[in-house]
């Protein structure tokens, strides 16, 4: 492949794209002044994400820990409430956790081993014209024939060549690293205000604990940290910690309408991972989709029309699933549904299996509702149908839930298409 590629950002998307392209003979330059670094997320890497990078990243390459179970706490409002936790056991290798700094460093090492070069400088501007790309750092300009923006939610490449994310398209993850303690269990505490959940994710030598809220939901980072501290105290998730280190980070959180009109690429450039908005709106997990988008551009640059080919591939491997998650998001965190879910986890082994697969990345949103309904006992199924109808009436008056013999059917007059927009639009 005779191609000069400039990649802004050395996270999973950028490093994996660099590895794949350099391996094919492209001349690849990665620009990032500070990678590898920790990322304020859970740190979990699903089995399907590990499978994507298995050829370049052997299992022995990372200091990692395997999650054995997930504990789900009862619904809380702005204050903690009492209730019974439900525990879901996970298969071995269903979910592993690693330091994001170590994971990113391993991918970057693989890219450099394949022939990519790293320029440890901050990119201050990019220019695209009909003949070439210019990437500007404080020390001068670098030129290429194709530009990849893999520089996160605050992507400079996105701001210059597409549209910056609006506030309502972002969420804020805020919390603490709890040093000096770890475990082999995820802990999730559902909350109704803001709608979502608190989490405690173990890493090899500490816990990542936090909460996520839409950026336009009216909560400051300080308020979210206070709620996290209250939960840490109430749930006892960080007993024995030696130090709490605060963090805060923006994460894309798009609606179904946003995904239908997503900015992915244009002539001689594309966006990957968080920079493209390829993050699950429910779990805020983006590593798998970042890696798959990197694979998409590596394959598309061999095509006659790389932009169209890339856009098609991303819609096939990511957008359809993410748009479904976006359509489910508000209903998923409704108090009535959360209470039903916790009851089902307590009473149904089938539902616990579904949740384990969802955590591990094996369960798609496309079949989630029907698999849940099929696994429920008769009494829970009746409650589920009633709950879904109530949520539909209260939150989605334009949608109808109807029953036909043997199944439930959801219809909608405002369902967004899963087909890609015009390339370069």
Residue ranges and their predicted role:
Residues 1-11:
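Beta1/beta-strand and adjacent pyrophosphate-binding region of the FAD-binding site
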Residues 299-425:
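C-terminal helical "tail/cap" subdomain of flavin- and related membrane-associated enzymes
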Residues 110-242:
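Predominantly flavin-linked oxidoreductase catalytic cores and closely associated redox partners
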Residues 47-106:
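A conserved beta-strand/loop capping segment in the N-terminal third of enzymes
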């Amino acid at each position: 492949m005779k191609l000069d590629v400039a990649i802004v950002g050395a996270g999973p998307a950028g490093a994996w794209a660099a590895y794949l392209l350099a391996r094919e003979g492209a001349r690849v330059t990665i620009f990032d002044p500070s990678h590898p670094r920790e990322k304020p997320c859970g740190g979990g890497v699903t089995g399907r994400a590990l499978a994507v990078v298995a050829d370049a990243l052997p299992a022995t390459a990372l200091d990692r820990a395997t999650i054995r179970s997930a504990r789900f706490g009862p619904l809380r409002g702005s204050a903690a409430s009492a209730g019974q936790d439900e525990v879901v056991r996970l298969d071995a290798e269903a979910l592993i956790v690693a330091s994001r700094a170590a994971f990113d460093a391993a991918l970057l090492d693989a890219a450099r081993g394949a022939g990519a070069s790293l320029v440890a400088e901050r990119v201050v501007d990019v220019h695209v014209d009909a003949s070439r790309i210019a990437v500007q750092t404080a020390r001068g300009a670098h030129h290429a024939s194709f530009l990849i923006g893999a520089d996160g939610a605050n992507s400079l490449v996105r701001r210059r060549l597409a549209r910056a994310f609006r506030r309502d398209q972002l969420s804020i993850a805020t919390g603490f690293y709890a040093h000096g303690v770890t475990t082999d269990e995820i802990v999730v505490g559902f909350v109704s205000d803001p709608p979502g959940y608190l989490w405690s994710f173990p890493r090899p030598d500490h816990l990542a604990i936090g909460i996520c809220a839409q950026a336009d939901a009216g909560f400051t980072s300080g308020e979210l940290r206070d709620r996290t501290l209250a939960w840490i105290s109430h749930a006892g998730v960080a007993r024995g910690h030696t130090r709490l280190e605060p963090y805060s980070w923006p994460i894309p959180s798009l609606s179904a309408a946003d995904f239908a009109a997503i900015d992915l690429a244009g002539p001689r450039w594309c966006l990957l991972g968080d920079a493209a908005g390829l993050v699950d709106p429910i779990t805020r997990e983006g590593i798998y989709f970042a890696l798959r988008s990197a694979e998409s551009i590596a394959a598309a640059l061999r095509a006659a029309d790389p932009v169209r080919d890339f856009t098609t591939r991303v819609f096939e491997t990511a957008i359809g699933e993410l748009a479904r998650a976006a359509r489910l998001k508000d209903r998923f965190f409704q108090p009535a549904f959360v209470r039903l879910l916790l009851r089902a986890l307590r009473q149904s082994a089938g539902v616990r299996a579904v949740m384990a697969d969802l955590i591990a990345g094996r369960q798609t949103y496309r079949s989630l509702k029907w698999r849940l309904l099929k696994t429920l006992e008769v009494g829970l199924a009746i409650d589920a149908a009633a709950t879904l109808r109530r949520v539909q009436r209260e939150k989605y008056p334009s949608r109808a839930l109807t029953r036909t013999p043997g199944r439930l059917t959801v219809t909608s007059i405002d369902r967004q298409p899963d087909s890609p927009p015009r390339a370069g639009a």
